[in-house]
């Protein structure tokens, strides 16, 4: 065995050993329990970043742990290869996106292999390959025929210069990111998936996901947004019908979750695209200008929630069906046409957004909710937001101080007034509804509106149908042919895939496919006449919504997934990825699983049994202000820091010139802040095992990991120490058989070492398996090696115990630092580590013959005693009373009482 730890030599050798033995290439094996571990596949952007390293190391630790525990482990890898970055890079470098993507895949694959991940590369897939997206197109056509996929007009951001649709993130201050042109909203035909048909199941099945973070499930519940409310129809005033047709001339329909507050409505707001807005603007230039302004704004719901609320009155009126009040209709920029009916009733006294709007335009506010606090304690009032001098008022405002208080509306308390639906909130100023609580009023309003045909109860979801059309090139072609005679015709299965041409260099001006007659000119599958192929491509979330099933049988040519493989592998047992994917990707993956189940392709309801959302990798940021008032971000490697006596950075200078730079704080590693660390440089300097160890030891997996050069060096020191420990053991003689059998003849010191060993095995097993806390597992092995170093193992028995400890330590660490452990195992044992299995806990070793017990006097620690593990209560009391500390602090006084906690402490009360 060589004396020095040399990762550059041992890591390639270990990887070759695994590759030659094909230990990570798996197939269905009914004799073993299966374990499908999957980390979210990467976008082939060019290079791995530290977030990738952390993500895939977590998955690898779990995979290797299960492999040693006898599971049939599948850990595949592939590439989420379609998407906008490839098009942008293609335009920048004048290269086809396909060539750029495939080059990146090869480089990143080399990087992944250098980290020693236990990946079954025989299952590798790339979503831009026709053999992959063929089956995506096939499912699309099946669902189109069933009506689950449909076509309708959708609103998009249109760049009039580049003649293309832009994503919301490509619109900067209302202008196209590339052309700088003012963006327009346009209505264009798009394809949608009816995810709303599955909203209830998607919501209910969250309760089945026992091993998902609650935060993720809450985010999905909120995104689905189930609400119970009512559809309310406000009759259009007779003097407001001009220009309106059909039902729009009869009534304005809204959805509300608070029909109990209908008497508090003081105006109605509609979206700019609403027919009533269009009719009102016909002869009013100021309305036309405002509608144009709204249409030029963002189409993102999140942006609308935060933008300044603006509106204009239409001069049109509708009638409140409960009290006959005429309410003015406003066009407001915060109302979405694609959400619900594109109209909302406004109750400014009890809704934050409505209050903000009404205050801006001096619109009336009518309070219809009152908090009743009879019999409540001050503490209960405070908990509800109305106690402790909150300023919400006490009494009726007439000085009576009555216990039955009308707490007046305060805008800063709007949530307490409107968001709470309990018996402490009752209606006022609502006629016959006065005094009713939420539920009673809801039922009364529902009955009244239904009786007069002005509304009915309705359950609604915030979730919208999923629009998957993208007017871009680098994506999966939509398999539809447009025929003037037959309409929209799905491409037959025997004509799939519709192959995307790969030799295209986009110029950013419109859709390349729409300029290629050789692509779009075709014949109708139904009538054989001339037809045009769809030139939109699919949202790239489509590919990532089912790739985990394709891994089960990536070369299967008769369907999306081999039925036998799908039955064996079932759901992914462990999924790993960032919480930023909590809503879209994870929701779409759940949706696709249910679609595929309903097509008879898979036999599971949910795709991922257990979900781990790892934290970000963060690092310090530094900058200098430039002449333009901006910031030039400086890489941490180029900065020299000065620290105070507590190790905190107090100043920083640029190494090349010694001049100050600004310390800007810790942020996620990113190109924009220039605070990334290249994993390849780390691997070249310290080896893959050091990178893996640091990533797993620096923080629990679900928390952010702060980059630390000293932490990396510390990880490398530990691996050198591990190597040196085994080297020194073997230097003293050849490896022996590990200790086995009864430990009756062992010294106390060796028994203590074995106790530490087997308690460590138990802890590390729990840390890897149940808790998934890898940093504490590493710390436990470090503690074990510390005790090993302090134990004399020079005797013949000692060497057998030493062999047992070192063999176990190497296996315990193999999931995290597999290269060094593989090499050390070969030196210690000579066999194949992956065949050795996980070390078993010797229960006998956990039983200690002697234990240490604390001695207290009046509750304060005054000493410790070592006694037999089975010592009686009387023996413990006698031993404690005899200790030097007890004698000193009892000061000759008799013990009033002696409290014994078996195995832990004796407390003498004097």
From Swiss-Prot:
<dbReference type="InterPro" id="IPR013155">
    <property type="entry name" value="M/V/L/I-tRNA-synth_anticd-bd"/>
</dbReference>
<dbReference type="InterPro" id="IPR001412">
    <property type="entry name" value="aa-tRNA-synth_I_CS"/>
</dbReference>
<dbReference type="InterPro" id="IPR015413">
    <property type="entry name" value="Methionyl/Leucyl_tRNA_Synth"/>
</dbReference>
<dbReference type="InterPro" id="IPR009008">
    <property type="entry name" value="Val/Leu/Ile-tRNA-synth_edit"/>
</dbReference>
<comment type="similarity">
    <text>Belongs to the class-I aminoacyl-tRNA synthetase family.</text>
</comment>
<keyword id="KW-0648">Protein biosynthesis</keyword>
<dbReference type="GO" id="GO:0006429">
    <property type="term" value="P:leucyl-tRNA aminoacylation"/>
</dbReference>
<dbReference type="InterPro" id="IPR025709">
    <property type="entry name" value="Leu_tRNA-synth_edit"/>
</dbReference>
<dbReference type="InterPro" id="IPR009080">
    <property type="entry name" value="tRNAsynth_Ia_anticodon-bd"/>
</dbReference>
<dbReference type="InterPro" id="IPR002302">
    <property type="entry name" value="Leu-tRNA-ligase"/>
</dbReference>
<dbReference type="GO" id="GO:0004823">
    <property type="term" value="F:leucine-tRNA ligase activity"/>
</dbReference>
<feature type="short sequence motif" description="'KMSKS' region">
    <location>
        <begin position="668"/>
        <end position="672"/>
    </location>
</feature>
<feature type="binding site">
    <location>
        <position position="671"/>
    </location>
    <ligand>
        <name>ATP</name>
    </ligand>
</feature>
<keyword id="KW-0963">Cytoplasm</keyword>
<dbReference type="GO" id="GO:0005829">
    <property type="term" value="C:cytosol"/>
</dbReference>
<feature type="short sequence motif" description="'HIGH' region">
    <location>
        <begin position="42"/>
        <end position="52"/>
    </location>
</feature>
<dbReference type="Pfam" id="PF13603">
    <property type="entry name" value="tRNA-synt_1_2"/>
</dbReference>
<keyword id="KW-0030">Aminoacyl-tRNA synthetase</keyword>
<dbReference type="GO" id="GO:0002161">
    <property type="term" value="F:aminoacyl-tRNA deacylase activity"/>
</dbReference>
<dbReference type="Pfam" id="PF09334">
    <property type="entry name" value="tRNA-synt_1g"/>
</dbReference>
<dbReference type="InterPro" id="IPR002300">
    <property type="entry name" value="aa-tRNA-synth_Ia"/>
</dbReference>
<protein>
    <recommendedName>
        <fullName>Leucine--tRNA ligase</fullName>
        <ecNumber>6.1.1.4</ecNumber>
    </recommendedName>
</protein>
<keyword id="KW-0436">Ligase</keyword>
<dbReference type="InterPro" id="IPR014729">
    <property type="entry name" value="Rossmann-like_a/b/a_fold"/>
</dbReference>
<dbReference type="GO" id="GO:0005524">
    <property type="term" value="F:ATP binding"/>
</dbReference>
<dbReference type="Pfam" id="PF00133">
    <property type="entry name" value="tRNA-synt_1"/>
</dbReference>
<dbReference type="Pfam" id="PF08264">
    <property type="entry name" value="Anticodon_1"/>
</dbReference>
<keyword id="KW-0067">ATP-binding</keyword>
<keyword id="KW-0547">Nucleotide-binding</keyword>
């Amino acid at each position: 065995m060589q004396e020095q730890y040399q990762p550059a030599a041992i890591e390639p050798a270990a990887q070759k050993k695994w590759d030659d033995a094909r230990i990570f290439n798996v197939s269905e094996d009914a004799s073993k329990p299966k374990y499908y571990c999957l980390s979210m596949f990467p976008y082939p952007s060019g290079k791995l970043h530290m977030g990738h390293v952390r993500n895939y190391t977590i998955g690898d630790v779990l995979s290797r742990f299960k492999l040693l525990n006898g599971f049939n482990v599948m850990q595949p890898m592939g590439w989420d290869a379609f998407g906008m970055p490839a098009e942008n890079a293609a335009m920048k470098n004048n290269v086809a996106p396909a060539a750029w993507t495939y080059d990146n895949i090869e480089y990143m694959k080399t990087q992944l292999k250098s980290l020693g991940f236990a990946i079954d590369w025989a299952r590798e897939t790339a979503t831009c390959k026709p053999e992959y997206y063929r089956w995506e197109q096939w499912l699309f056509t099946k669902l189109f025929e069933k009506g689950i996929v449909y076509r309708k007009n959708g609103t998009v951001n249109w760049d009039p210069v580049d003649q293309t649709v832009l994503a919301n993130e490509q619109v900067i201050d209302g202008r196209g990111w590339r052309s700088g042109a003012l963006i327009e909203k346009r209505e264009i035909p798009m394809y949608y998936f009816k995810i709303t048909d599955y909203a209830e199941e998607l919501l209910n099945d969250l309760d089945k996901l026992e091993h998902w973070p609650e935060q993720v499930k809450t985010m999905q519940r909120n995104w689905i947004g189930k609400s119970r409310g009512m559809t309310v129809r406000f009759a259009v005033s007779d003097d407001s019908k001009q220009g309106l047709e059909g039902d729009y001339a009869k009534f304005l329909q809204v959805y509300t979750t608070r029909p109990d507050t209908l008497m508090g409505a003081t105006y109605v707001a509609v979206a700019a695209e609403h027919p009533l807005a269009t009719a009102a603007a016909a002869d009013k230039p100021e309305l036309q200008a405002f509608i144009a302004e709204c249409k030029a704004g963002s189409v993102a719901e999140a942006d609308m929630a935060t933008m300044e609320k603006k509106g204009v009155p239409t001069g049109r009126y509708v009638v409140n069906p409960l009290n006959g009040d005429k309410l003015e209709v406003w066009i407001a920029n915060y109302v979405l046409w694609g959400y619900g009916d594109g109209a909302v009733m406004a109750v400014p006294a009890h809704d934050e957004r409505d209050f903000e709007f009404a205050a801006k335009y001096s619109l009336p506010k009518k309070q219809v909710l009152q908090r009743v606090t009879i019999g409540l304690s001050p503490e209960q009032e405070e908990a509800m937001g109305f106690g402790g001098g909150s300023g919400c008022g006490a009494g009726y405002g007439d000085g009576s101080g009555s216990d039955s208080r009308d707490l007046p509306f305060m805008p800063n308390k709007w949530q307490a007034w409107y968001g709470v639906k309990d018996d402490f909130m009752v209606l006022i100023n609502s006629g016959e509804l006065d005094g009713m609580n939420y539920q009673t009023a809801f039922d009364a309003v529902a009955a009244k509106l239904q009786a007069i045909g002005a509304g009915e109860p309705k359950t609604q979801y915030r979730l919208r149908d999923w629009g998957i059309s993208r007017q871009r090139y680098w994506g999966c072609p939509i398999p539809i042919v447009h025929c003037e005679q037959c309409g929209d015709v799905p491409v037959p299965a025997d004509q799939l895939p519709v192959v995307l041409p790969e030799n295209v260099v986009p110029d950013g001006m419109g859709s390349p496919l729409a300029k290629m007659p050789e692509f779009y000119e075709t014949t109708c599958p139904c009538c054989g006449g001339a037809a045009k192929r769809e030139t939109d491509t699919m949202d790239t979330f489509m590919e990532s919504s089912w790739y985990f099933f394709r891994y089960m049988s990536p070369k299967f040519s008769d369907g999306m997934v081999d039925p036998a493989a799908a039955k064996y592998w079932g759901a992914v047992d462990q999924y790993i990825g960032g919480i930023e994917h909590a809503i879209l990707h994870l929701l779409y993956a759940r949706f696709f699983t249910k679609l595929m189940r309903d097509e008879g392709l898979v036999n599971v309801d949910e795709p991922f049994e257990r979900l781990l959302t790892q934290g970000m990798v963060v690092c310090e940021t530094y900058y200098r202000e430039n002449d333009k008032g901006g910031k030039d971000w400086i890489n941490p490697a180029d900065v020299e820091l000065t620290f105070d006596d507590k190790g905190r950075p107090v100043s920083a200078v640029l190494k090349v010139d010694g001049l100050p730079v600004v310390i800007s704080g810790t942020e996620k590693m990113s190109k924009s802040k220039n605070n990334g660390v290249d994993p390849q440089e780390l691997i070249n300097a310290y080896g893959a095992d050091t990178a893996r160890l640091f990533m797993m030891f620096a923080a629990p997996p679900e928390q952010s990991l702060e980059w630390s050069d000293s932490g990396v060096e510390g990880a490398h020191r530990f691996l050198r120490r591990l190597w040196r420990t085994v080297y020194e053991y073997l230097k003293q003689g050849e490896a022996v058989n590990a200790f086995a059998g009864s430990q009756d003849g062992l010294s106390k010191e060796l028994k203590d070492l074995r106790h530490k060993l087997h308690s460590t095995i138990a802890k590390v097993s729990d840390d890897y398996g149940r808790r998934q806390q890898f940093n504490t597992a590493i710390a436990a092995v470090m503690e074990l090696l510390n005790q090993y170093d302090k134990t004399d193992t020079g005797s013949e028995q000692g060497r057998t115990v030493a062999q047992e400890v070192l063999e176990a330590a190497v296996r315990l660490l193999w999931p995290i630092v597999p290269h060094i452990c593989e090499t050390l195992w070969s030196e210690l044992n000579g066999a194949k580590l992956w065949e050795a299995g996980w070390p078993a806990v010797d229960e006998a070793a956990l039983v200690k013959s002697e234990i240490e017990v604390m001695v207290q006097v009046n509750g304060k620690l005054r000493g410790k005693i070592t006694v037999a593990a089975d010592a009686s209560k009387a023996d413990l009391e006698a031993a404690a009373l005899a200790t030097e500390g007890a004698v000193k602090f009892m000061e000759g006084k008799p013990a009033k009482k002696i409290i014994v906690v078996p195995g832990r402490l004796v407390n003498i009360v004097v």
